[in-house]
């Protein structure tokens, strides 16, 4: 029996402008040093930029980009008799969404020049078109899982 109490997930309030839980989580992932207002401004500006460039609703482009960057399967190392195998496992939906958000933010931060809102908008637009670094990372993850399909029976 575990000695520590179970850690329960905190309920995250939806964001103020679009009333979206997913967007609220994204803002929290983007936030650095507790600067939530700055993170909100960056995300809302990025959504406005995406909406103008695509002539669609910015939130729809955001959701499509996030969906395209979301992985379905990943590999986890599993040690079996002295050898470490990369075992493919299915990703829980909440973890998959978190991974996609993390990859998009990382790719946007890596881009050079311009404001963060513009870089984030550019990365999201590319992700919504099945391009960009975040989608490439998802494809890489899927390829790795496909290559290690032989070890799927080591799943736990």
Curated annotation (Swiss-Prot):
Pfam families in alphabetical order: Ribosomal_S7
Similarity comment text for this entry: Belongs to the universal ribosomal protein uS7 family.
GO CC entries: small ribosomal subunit
Domain of life: Bacteria
HAMAP family: Ribosomal_uS7_B
UniProt cross-references to CDD domains, sorted A to Z: uS7_Bacteria
Protein name: Small ribosomal subunit protein uS7
NCBIfam families: rpsG_bact
GO biological process, one term: translation
Keywords from the named record: Ribonucleoprotein, Ribosomal protein, RNA-binding, rRNA-binding, tRNA-binding
Function: One of the primary rRNA binding proteins, it binds directly to 16S rRNA where it nucleates assembly of the head domain of the 30S subunit. Is located at the subunit interface close to the decoding center, probably blocks exit of the E-site tRNA.
Entry-linked Gene3D superfamilies: Ribosomal protein S7 domain
Gene Ontology molecular functions: rRNA binding; structural constituent of ribosome; tRNA binding
Record has Ribonucleoprotein as a keyword: yes
Assembly mode: Part of the 30S ribosomal subunit. Contacts proteins S9 and S11.
The species this protein was found in: Dehalococcoides mccartyi (strain ATCC BAA-2266 / KCTC 15142 / 195)
């Amino acid at each position: 029996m575990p000695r520590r109490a179970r850690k329960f997930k905190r309920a995250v309030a939806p964001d103020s402008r679009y009333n979206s839980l997913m967007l609220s989580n994204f803002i929290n992932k983007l936030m650095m040093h507790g600067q939530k207002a700055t993170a909100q401004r960056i995300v809302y500006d990025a959504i406005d930029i995406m909406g103008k460039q695509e002539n669609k609703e910015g939130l729809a482009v955001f959701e499509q980009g996030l969906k395209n960057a979301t992985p379905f399967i990943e590999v986890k190392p599993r040690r079996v008799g002295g050898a470490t195998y990369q075992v493919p496992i299915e990703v829980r939906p909440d973890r998959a969404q978190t991974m996609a958000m993390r990859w998009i933010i990382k790719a946007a931060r890596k881009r050079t020049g311009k404001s963060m809102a513009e870089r984030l908008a550019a990365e999201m637009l590319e992700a919504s078109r099945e391009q960009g670094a975040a989608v490439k990372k998802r494809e890489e993850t899927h390829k790795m899982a496909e290559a290690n399909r032989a070890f799927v029976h080591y799943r736990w």
